[in-house]
Structures are given as structure tokens and as C-alpha cells.
């Protein structure tokens, strides 16, 4: 196990800057999840750490050693890919032992590591099968097993669950988190799926346009997004972002330079509320039922602005209703549009 340090790490493709000066420290044994939309630079950054992409400038340290120009095989890290990357003509056992044989690990040690990985991942009964005889989830377990037997300083996960169906993704997500906590191996995990990110991470790193927007625990990032981008990206349904001038005259005690407020759908309540609340009337345009809640799509009365509210299915609402809504001051997130940042 080892800490990973990224110091002003940059990646350029000719005149295009894909990764723009990343500074990040992953503590020994920590699980960091890089999350962001397609093209934000998260996978490029992971490949730079793995050694699959050259670093344009900056420093990469693993366990205190600068490895930015060290061959990938010598960085003592293991990577788990989206497409499993298993050899189809080999059995599971042969896939697990292949890298160890190439590094001339002793036969007894190879057997010990394979037995340990098979026990942890519950794949012992599959050791003599070939990948085509396994389900998607079983293949992903084998891919993780191949990483475990290397006994690396760190794991790198590149969207490993993207090829699985929804039910299996949930199951494998739990298994990856359990495995990481059991092994206490420093881990970096890349995903565009915010639910995956929120449930797996010790800390989230939200990326956008090759830069870090915010670093924090999942609950910190959710409860206090530092930028307009993070506010609109983290959360499902996403946070409603409303320009103050779309609300008309209102008496709210907001920080100076606030011209945008963010409101979580769960913070919108039915009824007129109190004089200190943000209050508005709205028309119900669409109701989406998702379990115990409805995602209610509203058009604010007198404004060309639509918002989404998460309302209990016990509330008798119908499309076409005109309703009164309120949001307490603790449910308002103040931002400045020009800077893109919080004002409080």
C-alpha cells in the first residue's frame, strides 16, 4: 500500500490541454473516485497514473518515489478495465497466474496468491473454466482477482461496471467496496455514474474540463457544492439552478453578489410556508413516479423557468394543478453566475 501524489499534473495533445494542472493526494488505503462527464479528463488522468499516457508536465509520486517516467510494469499498480481484458484462450487460473509467471514469481507463491484471491472473490469453482463460460459479473471478479494476485501498491479502476446490467452493477459495487475495505489498498476509481461515485468513495474528486471542481466526502459534496457545475452534476434529479431575476420581487437575505440560487428537488415543499421562505406558485406539467416519491416537473408561475420537486406519492397531485411551494433558507445554495462559485 502507498500514498499517491499528483503535483501540477498536465497532459497536452498538441495545442489541446486535456488535463490542466491537477494537484491531489490519495492517502494510504484511501478510495478516491474521479467523477465527471465524458471528456472531463478523468480517464486520461487515470491512464497517466498507470503509465499508459505520457505526462506532459508535473510530478507523479507513489510511496514517495517519482514514477512519472517509470515504465508501467515497474510502478507496482494494478488496473481493472471496463472490458475485463481477459485472455479468452486461457482458463481463469491461467489468467490469474500469467503476469506472475512473467515476473518469475515462485510456483508456491503463485499458488498461494491464487488461492487467496479465489477465496476473497468466491471464484474457486471457476478456476478451470474459460472466460466465455462465465457471466459478466464472474468475468469482472476474475479481472479483480488478476489485480489482487499482483499484491500492488494501488488499484486503478477504469469504469469497471459499465458493461454490466443495472442489478449486477449494484451487486458488484458492493463487492468492490467490501474488497477495498478488506484489503485496505490505495485505490483510484473512474466513473461517470454519480450513484456509483457516491456509494464507493471515501472522497470524491469532481472533474470538469480537465480541472478539479471540488474534492470532498460524498456527503460534503452533496450538501455543499462549491460551484454551479457541481451543483448541477451531483444529485439525481439534479439541483435546480434559478436566476434570481426569474423569480420576480422577493425579500431574501442572501450573500452579496448572489444572482443564482440552487435548490435540491427534495427541499421544495408544498404550501405557502413562512415570510422568511422563498415562496412561489407553479403549474404541474409532468409527474414521474419513482418508488415512494414523485419527481414533479413544475413551471414557475409568471416565469419561463421549470424546476423539479421530489414530493411524496402520498400528496394528491395531478398534472395541470396549480400549487403553492416554499423553500426554507437552509435549502437555498447561493452562487454567482460570473464566477461560477458559491457566495457564502
From Swiss-Prot:
Membrane topology, as annotated: Peripheral membrane protein
Organism whose genome encodes this protein: Rhizobium johnstonii (strain DSM 114642 / LMG 32736 / 3841) (Rhizobium leguminosarum bv. viciae)
Assembly notes: The complex is composed of two ATP-binding proteins (UgpC), two transmembrane proteins (UgpA and UgpE) and a solute-binding protein (UgpB).
Matches recorded under InterPro entries: AAA+_ATPase, ABC_transporter-like_ATP-bd, ABC_transporter-like_CS, ABC_transpr_MalK-like, ABC_transpr_MalK/UgpC-like, Mo/tungstate-bd_C_term_dom, NA-bd_OB-fold, P-loop_NTPase
Job of this protein: Part of the ABC transporter complex UgpBAEC involved in sn-glycerol-3-phosphate (G3P) import. Responsible for energy coupling to the transport system.
PROSITE patterns referenced in this protein's UniProt entry, alphabetically: ABC_TRANSPORTER_1, ABC_TRANSPORTER_2, UGPC
GO molecular function, one term: ATP binding
Cellular component terms per the entry's GO annotation: ATP-binding cassette (ABC) transporter complex, substrate-binding subunit-containing
Descriptive protein name: sn-glycerol-3-phosphate import ATP-binding protein UgpC 2
Record-listed ATP binding positions: 36-43
GO biological process: carbohydrate transport; glycerophosphodiester transmembrane transport
Subcellular location: Cell inner membrane
Keyword annotations: ATP-binding, Cell inner membrane, Cell membrane, Membrane, Nucleotide-binding, Plasmid, Sugar transport, Translocase, Transport
Similarity-based family: Belongs to the ABC transporter superfamily. sn-glycerol-3-phosphate importer (TC 3.A.1.1.3) family.
Residues covered by the ABC transporter domain: 4-234
Main enzyme class: translocase
Catalytic activity line of the entry: sn-glycerol 3-phosphate(out) + ATP + H2O = sn-glycerol 3-phosphate(in) + ADP + phosphate + H(+)
Enzyme Commission number: 7.6.2.10
One Pfam family per UniProt: ABC_tran
